[in-house]
Amino acid sequence: MGQIEWAMWANEQALASGLILMTGGIVATAGQFTQWYLGTYSIAAGVLVCLLEYPRGRRTKGSTMERCEQKYMTKVVKAFGPLSRNYYIRAFLHLGLSVPAGFLLATILGTACLAIASGIYLLAAIRGEQWTPIEPKPKERPQVGGTIKQPPSNPPPRPPPEARKKPGEEAVAGVPRGAPRKTPCPVTDEVV
């Protein structure tokens, strides 16, 4: 049985916790809680976490399903270099972002989720995992000569293979090539 790639779990957990943190921040700010400024901090922290976590990393084995329009954010995250690739840095960044939001009831759920994501990222870093971007593979165009052995000789619709006659069979049957064939039923041009 293969090893678990913890970074994939941490990525999903952190993205969800960023959304939860933003939602709690909106509730705290709109509800004018006593420490509403922590709500605005939570909105900003949630947006930062979501932007950092939106692009999925490539799995070491198998294929990875890319998120919609991920390629644009991948370029931004990739530009930060080792700051975004290293999971130790992500773990401590998420843990640091979650602490101030823990002092407000509306954002405590997002704080707990982000702390759990931080722990999973720390586990992924200890196991030696690293973020690598999903890069699109260049599309190979099939060679026309390589895929088609011999193009069809007669236009569609074509009769089934067993009904087709070989060119030599008509000559053996005594029917000259291109000559009209005789039908067993009489054909008339009258319209009834």
Swiss-Prot record:
Q: How is it modified after translation?
A: Phosphorylation at Thr-147 enhances NADPH oxidase activity by promoting NCF1/p47-phox binding.
- Lineage top rank: taxon: Eukaryota
Q: Which GO terms describe its molecular function?
A: heme binding; metal ion binding; oxidoreductase activity
Subcellular localization(s) per the UniProt record: Cell membrane
Membrane topology classification: Multi-pass membrane protein
Q: What's one GO-annotated cellular component?
A: NADPH oxidase complex
Residue numbers on the Cytoplasmic membrane side: 2-7, 54-69, 81-86, 127-192
Q: Name the coiled-coil region(s).
A: none
Recite the UniProt keywords alphabetically. Answer: Cell membrane, Electron transport, Heme, Iron, Isopeptide bond, Membrane, Metal-binding, NADP, Oxidoreductase, Phosphoprotein, Transmembrane, Transmembrane helix, Transport, Ubl conjugation
- Residue ranges crossing the lipid bilayer per the database entry: 8-30, 36-53, 87-104, 106-126
Instruction: Return one Gene Ontology term, BP aspect.
Output: innate immune response
Using the UniProt entry, state the residues involved in the cross-link Glycyl lysine isopeptide (Lys-Gly) (interchain with G-Cter in ubiquitin), renumbered to this chain.
K149
Q: How does it assemble?
A: Component of the phagocyte NADPH oxidase core complex/cytochrome b558 complex, composed of CYBB (heavy chain (beta)) and CYBA (light chain (alpha)). Component of the phagocyte NADPH oxidase complex composed of an obligatory core heterodimer formed by the membrane proteins CYBA and CYBB and the cytosolic regulatory subunits NCF1/p47-phox, NCF2/p67-phox, NCF4/p40-phox and the small GTPase RAC1 or RAC2. Interacts with NCF1 (via SH3 domain). Interacts with SH3PXD2A. Interacts with DUOX1, DUOX2 and TPO. Interacts with NOX4; this interaction mediates superoxide generation.
What family does the database annotate? Belongs to the p22phox family.
User: What's this protein's name?
Assistant: Cytochrome b-245 light chain
Species name: Sus scrofa (Pig)
